């Protein structure tokens, strides 16, 4: 489902200017709030900086979606379906006793998505989004490097003097260094958050720039991701690098992405037949720092999947999932958590939205300048989605995913800002110019 010609006209007439004027302060406000570690309690709600921003701009964003100025796309309805099903699942299991969780969960699932749909409707707004995400990563970087070396969380210590902050997670060193948590609740969340910027910085901010420029900027993102010492975050970077390499090596092939999908599908079938355990377990076993972690993830997948099969419609809510007593209750797989907590319909809604985004953007006929924008966007989204198989994401990192999903749909009907037909420009010039005996009035 794509926007009609009339909708595109309305977008050009009103949406762009509105998006630019609003985005001039909402985008930096949102991304700076993502990296603020302070929160407070109000009427049973845990409110942080980014949650306040989402609550303030949720209604305006929905109004801008309802007026049709940005068009209507299938992922819009699928994201709404995902959010409504999560609420329904919690009400099914716990009644309205979890009303505060349901309210915040609904806003975190839909707010970032529809704010992105409202604000990002052209190339300029998309570039501003990437720039502010990059700035957020850079602002966290020196504090994270310091924690990586000294194990001192300057950010959390500093903000703890003015309010309640996330607790510092005591984790054992890796590779002789300490895991940087930044202003996030966990090093994993910090690392995954930073990793999303890699391809976007390379292809969007680095578009038409020198190789040195791209490496210097994207290198900062890699460093920020590295100091989290999170295998899941590193995986996101590796996936993006792999896709970038594939694109360059097989640039001469028209169907290179189809070939990659066929190869990955064939590899999965081969492992399913030839390996002594499911591919998902192999994936978990080899993408970890320690064998004990791999063993734990395999057991999580086995026991939690069984619970999903036994409770396919509404999941388990916040009820305990079946596991041995010696296992912790955390589930290091975002997609599995969605199915386990809310049921398979919630997972299907969310995954379907992502697949549809790939399909409609892959088929979009873009001007040559915007091809790199699409690559950066899809590569970053792919890295996030694959990393989410090995980690669970929540809080600001989850909101970043939802924002990212809504941030790329403008490209479906995008035109370069300089693509106005010459004939229209000439006609416009002729209408503006008024001649007198002294020459054109404009002179």
Report each predicted region and the residues it spans:
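Hydrophobic transmembrane alpha-helices and their immediate junctions
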Residues: 211-214, 222, 238-248, 342-385, ...
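Interfacial loop-to-transmembrane-helix boundary motif in multi-pass membrane proteins
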Residues: 22-26, 74-83, 116-158
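Alpha-helical transmembrane segments of multi-pass inner-membrane proteins
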Residues: 130-247, 359-360
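A membrane-periplasm/extracellular boundary helix in multi-pass inner-membrane enzymes
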Residues: 142, 146-152, 245-288, 305-310, ...
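N-terminal hydrophobic segments of proteins, predominantly signal-anchor/transmembrane helices
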Residues: 20-42, 51-111, 271, 384-387, ...
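Membrane-interface helix-loop-helix junctions at transmembrane boundaries of multi-pass membrane enzymes
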Residues: 15-22, 62-77, 203-217, 248-258, ...
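Long extracytoplasmic/lumenal interhelical loops at the membrane interface
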Residues: 277-345, 357, 361-369
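Transmembrane alpha-helices of multi-pass inner-membrane enzymes
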Residues: 56, 258, 376-387, 392-443
């Amino acid at each position: 489902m794509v926007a009609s010609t009339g909708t595109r006209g309305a977008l050009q007439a009103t949406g762009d200017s509105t998006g630019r004027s609003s985005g001039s302060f909402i985008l930096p406000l949102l991304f700076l709030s993502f990296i603020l570690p302070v929160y407070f309690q109000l009427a049973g709600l845990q409110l942080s900086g980014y949650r306040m921003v989402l609550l303030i701009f949720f209604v305006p964003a929905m109004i801008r979606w309802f007026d049709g100025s940005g068009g209507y796309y299938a992922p819009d309805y699928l994201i709404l379906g995902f959010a409504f099903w999560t609420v329904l699942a919690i009400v099914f299991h716990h009644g309205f006793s979890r009303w505060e969780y349901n309210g915040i969960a609904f806003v975190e699932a839909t707010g970032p998505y529809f704010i992105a749909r409202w604000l990002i409707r052209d190339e300029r707004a998309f570039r501003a989004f990437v720039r502010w995400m990059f700035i957020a990563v850079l602002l966290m970087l020196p504090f994270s490097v310091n924690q990586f070396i000294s194990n001192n969380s300057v950010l959390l210590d500093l903000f703890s003097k003015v309010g309640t902050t996330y607790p510092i997670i005591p984790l054992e060193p890796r590779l002789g260094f300490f895991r940087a948590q930044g202003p996030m609740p966990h090093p994993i969340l910090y690392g995954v958050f930073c990793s999303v910027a890699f391809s976007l910085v390379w292809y969007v901010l680095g578009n038409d720039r020198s190789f040195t420029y791209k490496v210097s900027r994207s290198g900062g993102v890699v460093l920020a991701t590295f100091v989290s010492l999170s295998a899941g975050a590193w995986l996101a970077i590796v996936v993006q690098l792999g896709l970038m390499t594939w694109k360059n090596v097989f640039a001469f092939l028209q169907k290179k992405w189809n070939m990659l999908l066929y190869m990955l599908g064939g590899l999965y079938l081969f492992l399913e037949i030839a390996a002594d355990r499911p591919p998902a377990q192999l994936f978990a076993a080899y993408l970890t720092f320690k064998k004990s972690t791999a063993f734990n993830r395999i057991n999580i997948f086995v026991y939690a999947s069984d619970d999903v099969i036994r409770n396919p419609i509404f999941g388990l809510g916040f009820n305990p999932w079946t596991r041995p007593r010696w296992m912790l209750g955390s589930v290091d797989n975002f997609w599995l958590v969605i199915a386990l907590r809310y049921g398979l319909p919630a997972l299907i809604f969310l995954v379907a939205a992502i697949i549809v985004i790939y399909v409609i953007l892959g088929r979009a006929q873009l001007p040559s300048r915007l091809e790199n924008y699409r690559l950066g966007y899809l590569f970053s989204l792919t890295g996030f989605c694959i990393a989410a198989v090995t980690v669970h994401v929540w809080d600001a990192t989850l909101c970043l995913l939802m924002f990212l999903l809504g941030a790329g749909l403008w490209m479906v009907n995008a035109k370069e800002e300089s693509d106005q037909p010459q004939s229209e420009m000439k006609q416009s010039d002729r209408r503006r110019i008024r001649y007198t005996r002294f020459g054109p009035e404009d002179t």
